Every structure is written in C-alpha cells, then in structure tokens.
From Swiss-Prot:
UniProt free text on domains: Comprises two domains: an N-terminal domain containing the nucleotidyltransferase activity and a C-terminal HD domain associated with both phosphodiesterase and phosphatase activities.
GO BP, one annotated term: RNA repair
InterPro entries: CCA_bact, HD/PDEase_dom, HD_domain, NT_sf, PolA_pol_head_dom, PolyA_RNA-bd, tRNA_CCA-adding_enzyme
Keyword Transmembrane: no
Family matches, as PROSITE patterns: HD (PS51831)
Binding sites annotated in the UniProt record for ATP: G8, R11, R91, R137, R140
Cofactor annotation: Mg(2+); Ni(2+)
Family under the similarity heading: Belongs to the tRNA nucleotidyltransferase/poly(A) polymerase family. Bacterial CCA-adding enzyme type 1 subfamily.
This protein's encoding gene: cca
Catalyses which reaction(s): a tRNA precursor + 2 CTP + ATP = a tRNA with a 3' CCA end + 3 diphosphate; a tRNA with a 3' CCA end + 2 CTP + ATP = a tRNA with a 3' CCACCA end + 3 diphosphate
Co-factor binding comment: Magnesium is required for nucleotidyltransferase activity.
Name of the molecule in the record: Multifunctional CCA protein
All residue ranges annotated as the HD domain in the record: 228-329
Amino acid sequence: MKIYLVGGAVRDSLLNIDVKDKDWVVVGSTPQKMDSLGYQTVGQDFPVFLNPKTKEEYALARTERKSGQGYKGFTCYAEPDVTLEEDLLRRDLTINAIAQADNGELIDPYNGQQDIIDRTLRHVSDAFTEDPLRVLRVARFAARFHHLGFTVAPETMHLMKVLVDSGELSHLTAERVWQEWQKSLSSQHPEIFLSTLKECGALAIVLPELNALFGIPQPEKWHPEIDTGIHTLMVAQQAALLSQDLPTRFAAQVHDLGKGVTPESEWPSHKLHCHTGIKLIKRLCDRVRVPNDYRDLALLVCEHHSNIHRAAELRAQTFIKIFDKMDVWRKPERLAPILLCCQADHAGRLGLETQPYPQKKRFEAAFDAAKNVEVKDVVAAGFKGPEIREELSKRRIEAVKDKLNIK
C-alpha cells in the first residue's frame, strides 16, 4: 500500500500558490484495509475515505470506463492492482495529473510539469471527451489561471468542441453548472470562463441567455465596443476589479440579458431591456438554481441600472421611488453592490474603462440625506395612518433636493 499526494495540491505548490486542500490517492489497498486503519468511508460513487486525524480525503486508485451518458455515466474499477499511472490517466488536465510521493519525488507520466512551465491547459488523454463536466472545468481553470498566462491548448479546445457537438452537455445537472460558474466568479478573470465557453460552443447550451448577447449591436456613441456580448465580458472584468463579492460579480454579468431579446427592428437601441431582462434573469436563476441573494441583487441591478446612469437628470422624487423599489430603507446594505455593478457597467466600454462615474456619489449622497428623515418625527408631528408614508416621502424628497441642490 502506497499513498501519494495528487491533483490541485501538487499543481498549486508548483505554481507557488498556497495549498488549501490536500487530496491523496492510495495504491494497493482495499476498502476493508482502509476501514481497519480507522479511515471513514464517505464516497458513494467510488471508494473515498477521510483520514481520522486530518479529515483529508484519501481515494483508492481507480480507473473509469464510460457506461452511460453525462458526467455520471461511468463504471469505476478500484481494485488493488490499479497503478498510480492508470489513476492519473483518467484525470482531466495534465497539470492535475501529477503525484508526489512521501519522499517528495514527483511522478509525472503525462508531462504536467512542462505544461505548467508552458502555461498550457492540456487534456491527459482522448478519454477527456467522455465527461461533459470537463468543458466547464477547463473554462474555470482558464479563468482561475489567466492572470498567470495560462491558455487552453488548441487540441484540447478541439476536444471541447467535440464534446459540445456530441450533445453530452445537455446531461449536466443544474447544480454542476452553477457550481462551476460560481467557482469561476471568485477568480481574477471571471470573464474568461464565459469567453472560453463561448469559444467552444458550450455557452449556447448551458447559458443561452448570455450567449444570445453576442452579435447584438448597441449604439456606438455610448458603446464603442458595439457588441453586447463583448460589453458583457468587459463588465464582468470590471466588476472583478471593483469587488470581491460574488453576488455583485454575478449581477454584473447578467445585467443586460434583456438586450438579447430586443427586436432586430429596434437595434441598436434597447429601450426596454431593463424590463425584459427581469424575466430572463428569473428564468436563468430558476433553471441553474442560483441562490436567492445572487438572484435578488441581479434583478435590482437589471431593473435600475439605466436610471442610475442618469443620476444627474433625475428629479428628487425619482430618487425616492427608486429607493422605495430597492427597499433600501430596510436593507441599506443593498445600495453599495448595486452601485458597484453600475460602475462596472459604465467602465465596461471600449476606451472608457477609466472614465469617472460621478453617478455613484450622487446616489450615495441622495440616500444619506433621505435616510436621515426619521419616521418618529413624522408621527410626532401628528400624522396618522396612510398620512405617515405620504409625509415621510415628502420630507425625504425635500432632503434630497437640499442635498443635491435640485430645484
């Protein structure tokens, strides 16, 4: 029985990245042997065990044979005669198929170290095409390691296209699609996840609402990049620069979905996209099972971003109406991420990335003034019932007028 450190821990140490999780592969053992050593069985689909002391995962070396459709359509063989090289062969990318022995020796039968040096994401074998989840995983790794210069090998991109054409991606569950998308949001370049899926054709299958944005024109006066899909990628990049918050990054990526259904006769204008996008975001979030906090923020950004961009033109009562709809009186923490998304939208335009966004400060100032109007003061003044809300709004409007010098 031999134990090796494998996968991401070996890869990240070679990239001088802090290793957070360690996975181990055990060669020459059995479930009975692992049980006798005190390891706890946790794997349902194949033999995986938790170390009783470290709680790290130890998996028996195994091979996989395609036996059905989708990423679960595999038959596993995990007997003691499975070699380390056979176990590494089933892995997705060469950079993830390096093992380390307890003496520090690296076992690298598929040249993963060279691909790390060359900054290349390359499949281990043609068995890559047996698992549709690997398309999303490669896109996520492309996003995660983009800042280090990694790109997808042309031959791997070809196999990703083969997988897409096979129809296998339709068997991915909503949970797995969201899991990979959500992980990509935490990378320095989440837009690369989307652009990689677009390049191989997978975006049209797993996230058709986003795919529909590519090729849709916008007014060149406001959007020198013209293409709404390109704009969306730029906004995703800007949001990642502005915020570490994942719901904020998600909302920025989907804020313009309504432009994908604008009638061609109305191009390049998209006057109703803030309205039409709401239905699309709801449908997308329901299908992919996006958490409610992500969904709620995305809907607010979609509905209000155009008005926020027009902050300099808004009347005081319009500010109050927007704040009412956002429910920021009860949930003031909502305002900051909404404004950050709008700032990312503003900056996600070709050649205008560093242009100031005074609208953000104007909205912040308006809210600071309005929130200082106290309900108790309105009640103390003798207002009752429905009069309270009406008077509260009036006082808030006056506060915004005074703060922003609106006549």
